[in-house]
């Protein structure tokens, strides 16, 4: 047999073998900010990322997101964290309110003794400024203090309001998991 026949036979055999595997019908899209993927109703509050692997004594960023909101003029968010494992290093305004015609007010309070951070974002005045859609309300930089797993959860006191200060029902809450090693 000639060398070209052997090479051709090997290539054709390889193609038959490699094409024999079926492609799995699994969904590979698992973005926690995709409203078709989340397992709760909208509007909702969630975190991104929802799973964080961090080294002990290192910083990591997490964003608080409002998903599927309509006519949002203000938000009050309380995020609970394990005070023995995490420490808030910085909190700053996200991008959802920053795209509006009016500058928003952003205020936060970290209660490290009880393990929560309150974040208030709103528009002031009677201009009826509001935003809609999905976007970041705040960015928080945490420092991991100890090795282990801890959760970041939203408190039931969280509130979203429209320009007339009417509550917008929050139908879902995501949570985050921090694994520090």
Regions found by a protein language model. Give the residues of each.
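Sec-dependent bacterial lipoprotein signal peptides
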Residues: 1-18
């Amino acid at each position: 047999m000639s060398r070209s026949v052997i090479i051709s036979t090997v290539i054709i055999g390889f193609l038959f073998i490699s094409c024999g595997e079926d492609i799995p019908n699994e969904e590979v899209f698992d973005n926690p900010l995709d409203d078709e993927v989340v397992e709760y109703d909208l509007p909702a509050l969630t975190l991104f990322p929802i799973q964080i692997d961090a080294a002990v004594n290192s910083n990591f960023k997490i964003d608080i997101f409002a998903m599927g909101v309509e006519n949002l003029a203000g938000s009050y968010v309380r995020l609970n964290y394990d005070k023995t494992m995490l420490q808030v290093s910085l909190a700053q305004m996200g991008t959802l309110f920053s795209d509006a015609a009016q500058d928003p007010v952003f205020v936060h309070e970290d209660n490290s003794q009880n393990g929560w951070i309150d974040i208030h974002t709103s528009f002031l005045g009677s201009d009826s400024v509001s935003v809609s859609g999905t976007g970041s309300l705040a960015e928080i930089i945490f420092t991991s203090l100890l090795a282990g797993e801890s959760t970041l959860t939203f408190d039931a006191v969280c509130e979203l309001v429209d320009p007339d200060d009417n509550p917008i029902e929050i139908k879902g809450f995501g949570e985050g998991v921090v694994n520090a090693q």
